[in-house]
Amino acid sequence: MAQVWKYYEIKDGKLIRKKKVCPRCGSFMAEHKDRYHCGKCGYTEWKVERPKIVIHGATIE
């Protein structure tokens, strides 16, 4: 069992989640070096903006 009590803190009498929560399904997201990822639904959020490549006026992300 993961030490789930480490994922929460009590502030002003309210329970606050320390980890990022998935906007799609509501479970905790795993924190990786360059992204946050939800193992339950597969949602991924990148920490840094990826550079955009412009070739002949067309933008590739």
Curated annotation (Swiss-Prot):
Transmembrane segments: none annotated. Its cofactor is Zn(2+). GO terms for biological process: translation. InterPro entries: Ribosomal_eS31, Ribosomal_eS31_arc, Ribosomal_zn-bd. It holds the Pfam family Ribosomal_S27. Signal peptide: none annotated. GO terms for molecular function: structural constituent of ribosome; zinc ion binding. Keywords: Metal-binding, Ribonucleoprotein, Ribosomal protein, Zinc, Zinc-finger. Binds 1 zinc ion per subunit. A zinc finger (C4-type) spans 22-41. SUPFAM superfamilies: Zn-binding ribosomal proteins. Zn(2+) binds at residues 22, 25, 38, 41. GO terms for cellular component: ribonucleoprotein complex; ribosome. The keyword Zinc-finger applies. Disulfide bonds: none annotated. Part of the 30S ribosomal subunit. Belongs to the eukaryotic ribosomal protein eS31 family. This is Small ribosomal subunit protein eS31.
